[in-house]
Design a protein with these regions (language model features):
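A short, polar/charged loop-to-alpha-helix boundary motif
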Residues: 76-95
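Cysteine/selenocysteine-centered motifs that mediate thiol-based redox chemistry or coordinate metal-sulfur cofactors
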Residues: 89-120
């Protein structure tokens, strides 16, 4: 229901705009995980300098729809807090037919049948 990622993502080159290319990819992945798994994604990224490397910060919280609820500033330390409502998970999942209509016992039974028919 909640994925927590802690990273030390260093700053790398600029993308087509004024953002670092690494920030764009990390944020896209976090949004994709949030919406694909209909989970909250909490990402805490290191900020500051160490051994000649710069870490960009930008910690965030993404909701089960893949939208940012909270986004920290880049290149600055911050203490961020965000309240999440786990009931939003049920509401979001009930709107998605793939998850709403999931039948895990059927899948388990069919996988067991396939394995029995094709032992390796």
């Amino acid at each position: 229901d909640v994925m927590i990622f802690v990273s030390s993502s260093p700053s790398r080159g600029l993308d087509s705009g004024d953002r670092l290319s690494g920030t764009r990819w990390v944020e896209l992945v976090n949004q994709a995980y949030g919406s694909m798994f209909t989970d909250y994604v909490i990402h805490c990224n290191r900020v500051g300098y160490e051994d000649g490397k710069n870490f960009w910060g930008g910690s965030s919280v993404v909701d089960p729809n893949g939208e940012f609820l909270l986004h920290g500033t880049y290149f600055e330390e911050a203490l961020l807090t965000q309240t999440i409502d786990l009931n939003d998970l049920h509401r979001t999942r009930s709107r998605l037919p793939l998850l709403r209509d999931e039948r895990p016992t059927l899948v388990q039974r069919e996988l067991a049948r396939i394995l029995m028919e094709n032992p390796s």
